Amino acid sequence: MVKVVLLAGGGGHTGYAYSLAQHLSGKCELEAFYPQNDELSYKRLSKYADTKALVLPRGPKTGMGPFLKGLARSFLQSSKLLKGKYVIVSTGNNFCIPPSLISWTKSNPIVSLEASVRFVGPSKTANILKRFAKVIALHWEEQKKIFPQGEVFGPIIAEPAVKSHNDGYVLVTGGTYGHSGLLKSLDSLDLENVVVQSGPHNLEKLKEKHPTWNIFGWSDKFHEILAGADVVVTASGSTVLESAIVYKKPTIISYNPEWTRTAKYEDILMLSKKVNGILLETFNHNSLMDAIEKARKQKPPEIKSGAGKLSKRILELAEEL
């Protein structure tokens, strides 16, 4: 049986890998690498693949010294863990660079997936891997301006975990690393039914002020929570696609100027237009309430997932080995 290795760098990157794993499972020998200590990625991917932990060289606040040490460790681990002939799939993030390059030295083809939020310029990982990748996979036609040699498959999104329904709550998610500006603005929000995914932030004071709210850090049942929301307020990761396209939720995308290593303002603006979402630029009670009302009036987009199409392309490459 042919072999495929998925690289899941956490958060939305794991979301892409999870979406592909749903289609690849049972059709190939499937391995998935995830960042050490990332229990959420492990729980999601272990349903479909043989999972292996690998060091994540750099997080949002990692300095250059620790980054270089982590990079060296990742190259060493990758050279020991990756064996045989296979297709390796990078879903973005610096996590994917060492195992991808080690695979290239072993003449194993790389599929490099660009992030769905990139419209103006490439991500660092995709830009590095473009010289080595057999296939550069894109979500949108507009991304051909960044990678003319890329292949467009459509947005890489998972099959719905449960049927979409409306339990009446506003879901606010700060993403994998949290969104301090957005989360601070919730303090004055005068709503009874709110669910908050806080990420690494401690929101004990917010819990005390809003005892009716459901506040949690992370959950492997997140998709069930997403499916029951009335409106979703989220960062610019893959939750945008899942909320607007998979579960047809009114979606608000919150721009985070603190994330200097991620997408630019123009990227977030274009993504919000693609999914008929509302872009949230300022974080206070009035702007948030106004965005919620505007989002409820938006019609969800009709866009097909590209996960099945990309999975088929990956298997075709594997058959050629």
Predicted regions and their residues:
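Nucleotide-activated sugar donor-binding and catalytic core shared by glycosyltransferases
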Residues: 1-321
